[in-house]
Amino acid sequence: MTQVLPSGLVASAVVAASSANLGPGFDSLGLALSLYDEIVLETTDSGLEVVVEGEGAGQVPLNSEHLVVRAIQHGLRAVGVPATGLIVRCRNDIPHSRGLGSSASAVVGGLAAVNGLVSQAGWVPLSDQQLIQLSSEFEGHPDNAAAAVLGGAVVSWIERCGDRADYSAVQLDLHPDIHLFSAIPEVRSSTAETRVLLPDLVSHDDARFNISRAALLVVALTQRPDLLMAATEDVLHQPQRASAMPASAEYLQLLRRHKVAATLSGAGPALIALTTNPDLPPEAVEYGAANGFTITAMTAGDRVRWKPGVAFSD
């Protein structure tokens, strides 16, 4: 007889937003940000109920197609135990379709919440490596997912063997002098829509340029933040995406003219700025506010947290 999770178990997870690429580190570098979603699960005898508060309420599906639900089912299959029924409550603060890793956070949060359930019933929770692998299988690349799992800054990579892709990541010790800012516009953009703007092939010169900058960025993030301007230069994806988000592209250039190491956050249209100054230049703040950007001082986000029982916010 197949074992199932008993009814009445409650678990929760809190997961951070993330910024991928950071300029040159396309699909490999990521940074968790101090903006969080919370997921609360409860097992029931049957059925599925999905409740969404905050970002996405009234817009995302409230059935088995919901990304968090799909991640939960993926995690339960990986552990090897089903649930006969679920109540899934999502409290979302991470903006959708802005380049802040909301989909990766949804997947990582759903998988982590599974750990809170199965740990109460005698099953071994998913490890960090399993969380990275399972969540990256949804995304197709591990940069956002790994940042959401591990917290802080990460370098991630893929090893392929035939049709299989193995996803891995290591965490970097972010230099304490680095200050983070997000600039989030009201407009939205989808990663799929902007990826079609990227060429299938790039020149050796462009590849060499980005390789050097991505390598330098690891040093800048951990040891030499004075190198952030040079280390965040990119020729592989940000110039190509500029036409799809002209306001973000213009603001990006303005920030960089003021010696702020700004990049697109993921596929945009949000921007992330890394600087050793505790404040952005007044001209940059004024321009952002006048052009529909919400500017927020951030810190590096924490690793995903899960626990059995009541919600973190209770």
Swiss-Prot record:
ATP binds at P95, H96, S97, R98, G99, L100, G101, S102, S103, A104, S105. The keyword S-adenosyl-L-methionine does not apply. It is an enzyme of class 2 (transferase). Keywords: Amino-acid biosynthesis, ATP-binding, Cytoplasm, Kinase, Nucleotide-binding, Threonine biosynthesis, Transferase. InterPro entries: GHMP_kinase_C_dom, GHMP_kinase_C_sf, GHMP_kinase_N_dom, GHMP_knse_ATP-bd_CS, Homoserine_kinase, Ribosomal_Su5_D2-typ_SF, Ribsml_uS5_D2-typ_fold_subgr. It catalyses: L-homoserine + ATP = O-phospho-L-homoserine + ADP + H(+). GO terms for cellular component: cytoplasm. Pathway: Amino-acid biosynthesis; L-threonine biosynthesis; L-threonine from L-aspartate: step 4/5. GO terms for biological process: threonine biosynthetic process. Its EC number is 2.7.1.39. Gene3D superfamilies: 3.30.230.10, GHMP kinase, C-terminal domain. GO terms for molecular function: ATP binding; homoserine kinase activity. The keyword Nucleotide-binding applies. Catalyzes the ATP-dependent phosphorylation of L-homoserine to L-homoserine phosphate. HAMAP family: Homoser_kinase. Belongs to the GHMP kinase family. Homoserine kinase subfamily. This is Homoserine kinase.
